[in-house]
Design a protein with these regions (language model features):
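C-terminal catalytic "cap/lid" subdomain
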Residues: 1-245
Length: 245
């Protein structure tokens, strides 16, 4: 869809939206842009797990999720982060709706590797009808990084992967992956642009590592699927632009 911008909010930004962020969203909406927000909630999940003296473990940048962890993750994403983000947007006159009952119907997923990651899913399909309906009504959908498989199991999904899938399914003009760092760093400097052909080598040499790996991988897939631009950074306008080449 022309004029659609998908924004993934993670890290500190997911806990409190800045005035600059709100003003940029308002400016885009005034210019006729349609916006979808996808969010994670890793910091809140970590805190809730710590309070319950439960371990946090990641493999290749993805959170290992036991079935018993799911209520905690659901509480963090739906009960805290998503609810707060939606309230902040609505309080700023940006009409928004948190997807709760519609989330499982919108995001279909399946286990990535149950033995390795537990209840962690990869997106198999995005049902766009409800999202398109909200966008047509100038409402910002707010999606937590959760989905359901064909058996109705709730699965934890990396928010970067989900945002990429949403952007690809809607054929958005832009995907923005917001994080706590300025972009992809090499020698302590932000790379203004990263070509898809350069990514494998950057991972092999350790320039791209940890939680940045799924971000970059999802960005590459999104660019190759036809989405116009993918930006990774700590704000809505600057960072590392992922481009095909």
């Amino acid at each position: 869809m022309k004029d659609v911008i998908v924004i993934k909010i993670g890290g500190v930004a997911a806990q409190k939206l800045s005035t600059k962020f709100i003003k940029q969203m308002q400016a885009w909406i005034a210019a006729g842009k349609k916006i979808v927000v996808v969010h994670g909630g890793g910091l809140v999940i970590n805190q809730l797990m710590k309070e319950r003296q439960l371990p946090t473990r990641k493999v290749k940048g993805l959170r290992v999720t036991a079935k018993s962890d799911l209520p905690i993750i659901e509480q963090a994403l739906l009960g805290q982060v998503g609810r707060t983000l939606t309230q902040e947007l609505n309080d700023s006159d940006i009409e928004s709706l948190q997807l709760v009952s519609h989330l499982g119907k919108t995001v279909s997923a399946d286990f990535i590797d149950k033995d390795l990651y537990g209840y962690v899913g990869d997106v198999t399909a995005i049902q766009t009808a409800y999202l398109e309906q909200l966008l047509a009504e100038d409402i910002v959908p707010v999606l937590a990084s959760l989905g359901e498989n064909s058996s109705g199991d709730l699965l934890n999904i990396n928010a970067d992967y989900l945002a990429a899938a949403v952007a690809s399914s809607l054929q958005a003009e832009k995907l923005i992956l917001m994080t706590d760092i300025e972009g992809v760093l090499e020698d302590k400097k932000v790379l203004p642009q990263l070509l898809t052909s350069q990514v494998s080598k950057k991972i092999q040499t350790g320039v791209i590592k940890g939680g940045m790996i799924p971000k970059i991988e999802s960005a590459v897939q999104t660019v190759l699927s036809g989405v116009g631009q993918v930006l990774i950074g700590d704000n809505l306008l600057t960072g590392t632009l992922i481009a095909e080449g």
